[in-house]
């Protein structure tokens, strides 16, 4: 029971350390199937950027498209969270960072960029959390918060500034 509580607390703080080889095999299989399926939604998401009326005029079923995008994002997020815990700020900060770096809203560019940038940032944060010299390891969330919080704050302040200027 004590080990289960410890495992739950570590999972709740976000950790890659408790994922076993068998779990990783299942994770890779699921991601190998689901990520390419999410790439099939790129055109749909680009159409949704145009607004509902334009997208509808171009033949997009808005309700169905939203359901597919939300379901796809939800399932992928749920799988990652089930394995690694809620690693906060990666999912919020990385898309905004990529949008700022590549200066585009085109999902043909953003989807692969976010995929690779998110993986790279997760690995870097995990390495920093396990830096030699620490007693044990910091939760990955403590490092992702240092990166993600300023990004999310800048997005919120920029949006607020734009609203005030209008």
Q: What is the predicted function of each stretch?
A:
Residues 1-166:
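Alpha-helical transmembrane segments in inner-membrane proteins
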């Amino acid at each position: 029971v004590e080990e289960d509580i410890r495992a739950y607390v570590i999972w709740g703080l976000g950790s890659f350390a408790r994922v076993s080889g068998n779990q990783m095999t299942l994770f890779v299989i699921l991601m190998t199937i689901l990520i390419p399926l999410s790439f099939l939604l790129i055109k749909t998401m680009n159409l949704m950027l145009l607004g509902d009326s334009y997208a509808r005029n171009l033949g997009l079923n808005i309700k169905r498209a939203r359901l597919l995008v939300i379901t796809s994002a939800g399932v992928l997020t749920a799988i990652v969270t089930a394995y690694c815990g809620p690693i906060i700020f990666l999912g919020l900060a990385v898309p905004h960072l990529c949008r700022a770096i590549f200066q585009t809203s085109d999902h043909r560019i953003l989807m692969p960029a976010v995929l690779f940038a998110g993986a790279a940032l997760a690995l870097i944060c995990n390495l920093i959390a396990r830096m030699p010299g620490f007693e044990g390891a910091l939760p990955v969330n403590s490092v992702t918060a240092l990166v993600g919080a300023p990004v999310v704050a800048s997005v919120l302040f920029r949006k607020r500034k734009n609203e005030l200027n209008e």
